[in-house]
Curated annotation (Swiss-Prot):
It comes from Nocardioides sp. (strain ATCC BAA-499 / JS614). Keywords: Ribonucleoprotein, Ribosomal protein, RNA-binding, rRNA-binding, tRNA-binding. HAMAP family: Ribosomal_uS13 (MF_01315). Belongs to the universal ribosomal protein uS13 family. InterPro entries: Rbsml_uS13_C (IPR027437), Ribosomal_uS13 (IPR001892), Ribosomal_uS13-like_H2TH (IPR010979), Ribosomal_uS13_bac-type (IPR019980), Ribosomal_uS13_CS (IPR018269). GO terms for cellular component: cytosol; small ribosomal subunit. PANTHER family: 30S RIBOSOMAL PROTEIN S13/40S RIBOSOMAL PROTEIN S18 (PTHR10871), SMALL RIBOSOMAL SUBUNIT PROTEIN US13M (PTHR10871:SF1). One of its GO terms (molecular function) is structural constituent of ribosome. Residues 101-124 have a biased composition (Basic residues). This is Small ribosomal subunit protein uS13.
Length: 124
């Protein structure tokens, strides 16, 4: 199994797809990296040589924030929004959708499991 920037890449997948296992690299960035390094995107990970892996690693580390650095930056951005008291920061603190989605129905992923509320009791 090839290891790139701290992530094990699956051996039997095409390198174009395998690069997307790295946090911060999607299909478009994977294609950009392969084009910049001149590596054939149709090769499988186990077919890559050491020099190709070194080229890929150097290109990724030089040009992109990935994995831990990117996760820290995203968390810092969220913390900053919470501290300055922006609308988005308040939504993050309350655990509600941040980008204007409806919350009367849906939003279950963000709000968590449904809490049942008891109805009114009938008077005798």
């Amino acid at each position: 199994m090839a290891r790139l920037v701290g992530v094990d890449l699956p051996r039997d997948k095409r390198i174009e797809i395998a690069l997307t296992y790295i946090y911060g690299i999607g299909r478009t960035r994977a294609q950009q990296v392969l084009e910049a390094t001149g590596v054939n995107p149709d090769l499988r990970v186990h077919q890559l040589g050491d020099e190709e892996l070194v080229k890929l690693r150097d290109e990724i580390e030089a040009n992109f924030k990935i994995e831990g650095d990117l996760r820290r930056e995203v968390q810092a951005d969220i913390r900053r929004k919470i501290e300055i008291g922006s609308y988005q920061g308040r939504r993050h603190r309350q655990g509600l959708p941040v980008r204007g989605q409806r919350t009367k129905t849906n939003a279950r992923t963000r709000k968590g499991p449904k809490r049942t509320v008891a109805g009114k009791k009938k008077a005798k």
